[in-house]
Amino acid sequence: MSNSNNNSSSGNHNSTTINNPKVNVYSNIPNSTTYTYGSGGGGTLSGNNTNNNNTNNNNNNNNNSSGDNKNHSPVTSATDRLTKMDIEEKWDNKNYEKDEREKSPLFHILASNLNSFGNFKVPSTFSLTPPEPNKQQQPQQQPQQQQPQQQQPQQQQPQQQQQQQPQQQQQPQQQLQQNNQQQQQQLQQQQLQQQLQQQQQQQQQQQQQQQQKQQKQQQQQQQHLHQDGIVNTPSTTQTSTTTTTTTTTTNPHTSGLSLQHAHSSYTPSNVLHSPTHFQSSLPTRLDTNPITTPIRQQQQSQQQLQQQQLQQIPPPTVNSFFLPPPVNARERLKEFKQIRVIGTGTFGKVYLIQNTKDGCYYAMKCLNKAYVVQLKQVEHLNSEKSILSSIHHPFIVNLYQAFQDEKKLYLLFEYVAGGEVFTHLRKSMKFSNSTAKFYAAEIVLALEFLHKQNIVYRDLKPENLLIDNQGHIKITDFGFAKRVEDRTFTLCGTPEYLAPEIIQSKGHGKAVDWWALGILIFEMLAGYPPFYDDDTFAIYNKILAGRITFPLGFDVDAKDLIKRLLTADRTRRLGALKDGALDVKNHRWFSDINWERLYQRRDNGPFIPKIQHQGDSSNFEMYDEEEMVEEPPSSNYVDPYAHLFKDF
């Protein structure tokens, strides 16, 4: 049996989402901005430009700002005129390159955005160099013709610069984008690798904890089996000195089978475990594909949580107590002494019997073959024997042997002396919230186990629940149990506990057991079922109507659980969803239940029945007595139903 700790009614699954905020190194650059050359320093957002006036103004401003030209003497001769023009022309060209470099929008883009990478300095040679003006000396008589020649290349410069600007501006931006993308990818890969390493380390730690839990649970399970005196377990070899004593069982459930076992006095501390620090120090192997999507990581984390919760409780072993049928049924029946009838049904009775050899007590279910055939219960009876002989669970009654004679079928069960839950519920009128929760939790574990075996119980009610001497539940009467892969259409069960899909003959499956659990919890807390009437068809109508009236003082969490279990739509019913019984176990009404401890029966139940001795039957109601074994028929008698129960 495995435990799983999700939260579905809580419905919560933890997931890890990787958030990698992108660092935008272009945050200072406007998305769509047109830069043009203006008369000031740097680009402006204006659309038009006057080249002639700006050029003349720049030349005039440069000349006026020059310290050498502030007090320059007037031209007195042609030679002085040429010398002055040559000096002014060189000065203008030098200032032109400097001003145009500073006015370039590309200069401001790089200067403003590349500062984040450190102390970046724009090289002095980085400029949009215009074509050099014509420096040929001309006669003094043509000064007015030279001035238009100087203005003409200056008019062509903005056009050439505007053509070169987009190409040169795009190249550094593309390089920066590529560098940033590479850095972001590297950061993402590093983060993903770190998360994968952490997940693998957590998985290793969880596996170590699970292994330790499984070892402890196996030891405790073996100790429990030793105490019950059921299996023959050899003494285990240990590092410390142990003493082994062989004893004969006196357990009332198994001593009639004449089994012996060896008790080994070992403790959990004697078992050697590998140190956790050594296991955690082992190198971890990274995944071959470390880059995964957040959706994939969420799915993996959900699957891991489900597996961890399901692996907390080990699966129960196969029923190793079941014995093959005896060679001679009549001789086998002579070994038992009939005490009294403790239960009755439509086609049979249940007897308390005692083994005459060792004095142990059992419950014998006797069924008349003719009645079984007349009521068309052959398939159900064969299914009950087949299922109980192949399963074992702490909260399901154990079947030890099945055999038949010429007229009857016999099922040998363990005797549960605490009586039926139905009897105790009628005496106390109703159970407390804690008592009902304890019984319901053990039933949830039993149903979870059965459903994993594809077994539908279909007859959950207080009459089929027994209480043992430690106060724990034992589910009995598997007459309606059936292995179902998908759906079945047989109409069977108790009217007050039938699910709507059974009444409507739509086909039913495992979801009907969760509906019956909701009815049972309501009845344990209220003292009566939610859908009750003297007329069977009136009960069916109330079930289909789905109106539930809760009494005053009903627990709020229990009310919410019952409403979720008693959902008419089986596709939305709690327990029948994707996570199955895990949704029921994660409901807040069961928040204080330790499922692993409950499965291992570490604590006694809330109610310990009064049992004077092993064969005490005072907790069962009185029934009319009837002989368990009939007289053998004549030697010429031929069993007409032998072919129907050949595998019994």
Swiss-Prot record:
Do you know which CDD domains this protein is assigned to? Answer: STKc_PKA_like
Q: Which Pfam families match?
A: Pkinase
Q: Which UniProt keywords apply?
A: ATP-binding, cAMP, Kinase, Nucleotide-binding, Phosphoprotein, Serine/threonine-protein kinase, Transferase
- AGC-kinase C-terminal domain: residues covered: 591-648
Region of interest (Disordered), residue spans = 1-25, 40-86, 121-175, 219-290
Q: Which residues form the active site?
A: D459 (proton acceptor)
Residues bound to ATP are I342, G343, T344, G345, T346, F347, G348, K349, V350, K365
Record GO biological process = adenylate cyclase-activating G protein-coupled cAMP receptor signaling pathway; c-di-GMP signaling; chemotaxis to cAMP; culmination involved in sorocarp development; establishment of cell polarity regulating cell shape; G protein-coupled chemorepellent receptor signaling pathway; MAPK cascade; negative regulation of gene expression
Bias-annotated ranges (Polar residues) = 255-290
Question: What range does the record give for the signal peptide?
Answer: none
Q: Which reaction does it catalyse?
A: L-seryl-[protein] + ATP = O-phospho-L-seryl-[protein] + ADP + H(+); L-threonyl-[protein] + ATP = O-phospho-L-threonyl-[protein] + ADP + H(+)
Q: Where is the Protein kinase domain?
A: 336-590
Q: What class of enzyme is it?
A: transferase
Q: Name one GO molecular function term.
A: cAMP-dependent protein kinase activity
Classification via PANTHER family: CAMP-DEPENDENT PROTEIN KINASE CATALYTIC SUBUNIT PRKX, CYCLIC NUCLEOTIDE-DEPENDENT PROTEIN KINASE
What the protein does comes down to: Essential for differentiation and fruit morphogenesis.
- This one is known as cAMP-dependent protein kinase catalytic subunit
State the organism of origin.
Dictyostelium discoideum
Q: Which gene encodes it?
A: pkaC
